[in-house]
Amino acid sequence: MQEIKMKTLSAGIIFMTEDKDLFMGRVTGSRKTGMMAHRWDIPKGRVENSDLSALDAARRECLEETGFSNYNPDLLEDLGVFKYSSNKDLQLFYYTIPVEHEMFRNCRCESYFENKDGVMIPEMDAFALIPRTQWQYVMGPSLYRIMNNLF
């Protein structure tokens, strides 16, 4: 009998300025040898059994990965569920009010993982508002495909 693998669902929030610069975090340790850029990502993560909804998961992940909570969750628009990879879908929520640089001044990642040397390090180690023209260089291909189609 063939085993059926269930797709996991991740959820994330898209925050943009009026000029469509996207709030992103730099993924710690993501710069590969010989590559110029680190990988950057939006605040997102797996929807856990303890989450009440995908929106709840997106808000939790945003807080864990960025420490950012200075927004009105009632202004998050559900953009839907997108195929992220063969084993993962991504549900995205868009903050409908443009954000400002100053809003992210005190961001800090509180979500840690153990690196190959056994040291606990934050998932994200820097934050920035990334212009649309740079997305293809800093995003992973799955996120870029989705964001390019949306915006």
From Swiss-Prot:
Pfam families in the record: NUDIX
CDD domains on file: NUDIX_Hydrolase
SUPFAM superfamilies on file: Nudix (SSF55811)
UniProt domain Nudix hydrolase: residue ranges: 6-143
Alphabetical list of Gene3D superfamilies matching this protein: Nucleoside Triphosphate Pyrophosphohydrolase
Cited InterPro entries: NUDIX_hydrolase-like_dom_sf, NUDIX_hydrolase_dom
PROSITE patterns: NUDIX (PS51462)
Disulfide bonds: none
Protein name as catalogued: Uncharacterized 17.7 kDa protein in e-segB intergenic region
Organism placement in taxonomy: Viruses, Duplodnaviria, Heunggongvirae, Uroviricota, Caudoviricetes
Gene behind the chain: y06L
